[in-house]
Amino acid sequence: MKLKLLLPVAMAALMIQPAYSATEYEFQEMQEKLQNAIIKINAMEQVIKSNADNKSGSVKTKSKKGLTIDTTGGGIKVKSGDQSFAIGGRLMMDYDSMDSNHNSNGKSFDDTEWRRTRINIKGSVNKNWSYKATYDINSEKNASNLDEGYIKYDSKQGLTITAGKTKADMMLEQRTSSKWISTVERGLLNAMNEKVNYLVGKPGDGAGVKLGFYDKDSRISGAFSVFDAYKNDDDDDKSNIWHTTARLTYSPKMNNGFGHFGVTYGVADYKGQETKADIQLGIHQGDKTLLAIESDTGDITNIGVEAAYVNGPFSLQGEYFDNETEKDNGTKGYEWDGYYGQVSYILTGETRGYKWKSGAFDKVKPAGKIGAWELVLRYEDISVDDLSEGTVSANKVDIDRTVLGLNWYATKTVKFMANYSSVSMDNMTNEAGDTDDLDSFQLRAQYTF
């Protein structure tokens, strides 16, 4: 029986002169209480109806004053006019199985790890100013750390200014969030740029400033970044090592899909510090492989090109990078270049999301009850030429890697990934011996909110 059925009885009781002598003030007070009760009953009925219709269990409510509370994304978002506040995050649990050549002790290895356990808060003060702070509560240092934190100004007329710890603008794959990359780990190009040069990704304990621009009509965007990102915590020289990066992207609409084209540039002066080209070969829990080393690094310069095409469930993307390292005295140091190509197809018909302002891929939104299923094939190659010192036979190492992947987007927030990876290397050995063939298998369970 609905609550409203009781209202006529209550109204009738109030209209009849009570047996006791009630003042006019008391009568008016009782009427006001009844009116307030009616308002609350209406609100309760709306919430009950909303929850009954909402099969996902999430809630989205809006008051008459414009305040909305939304939990449909798994987190919580509160919005009132131009002001907003949201809490979100990501949980990624990985399983890695590797053959003996991925480890210096020459033994096969398999293990699990929490790859990322991040929680973030973000919001806006008004239509121009916003902020974000992300903490990794289970970082590699076994302590919570600030993964990202910045304030941002958006003119809404094509100009942005970001100050703090945030990603530098280089590389399509790096700009794409780890939540929405198509393979469990980003590729070898990203590893060389992020772990060796520190020209992509987020700064260590430093920060910087990024100037961005965008034009809606032409779908052209870009950014220029200057930041202190040297990550050698053992360095006694505390002077800043400034990194400068720039990126320009163009995202034209093409028939039923769209294209993506970009160029990037980065430079940094390491002031005689040591740099090492040692990376994990696509497996986060595997040992690093030392490809080259420079004890007195001067300038490091990178230039890259990127392209992608999406049409319905089909997507294609690739990048090429060239790197040159100089010694502090101006002579030539090690250099490397490489590329990758990736093709994916979503068997259930969905399309990969894309944000043209940032020039990056975004989430896949499942359309049916079985979720979205995606097949991925990737091939990449890098060559490292060490002209001075290191562990390289004949001064040159060539690495080829092939990845076959299957992704299941069970819901908008739950994702499962499976990757098989095969790596071949020329002119390279480690403590375990010959590393011509490196095979691995990876699984990931992911929840984002």
Which sequence ranges carry the predicted segments?
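Hydrophobic alpha-helical segments, especially transmembrane helices
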Residues: 3-5, 166, 248, 416, ...
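Outer membrane beta-barrel
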Residues: 72-271, 336, 340-367, 374-387
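Outer-membrane beta-barrel pore domains
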Residues: 24-28, 35, 60-62, 105-106, ...
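Compositionally biased non-globular segments, especially hydrophobic aliphatic-rich helices
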Residues: 13-16, 40, 111
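Gram-negative bacterial Sec-dependent N-terminal signal peptides
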Residues: 1-20
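N-terminal periplasmic/intermembrane-space "pro-region" immediately following the signal or transit peptide
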Residues: 20-90, 219, 352-359
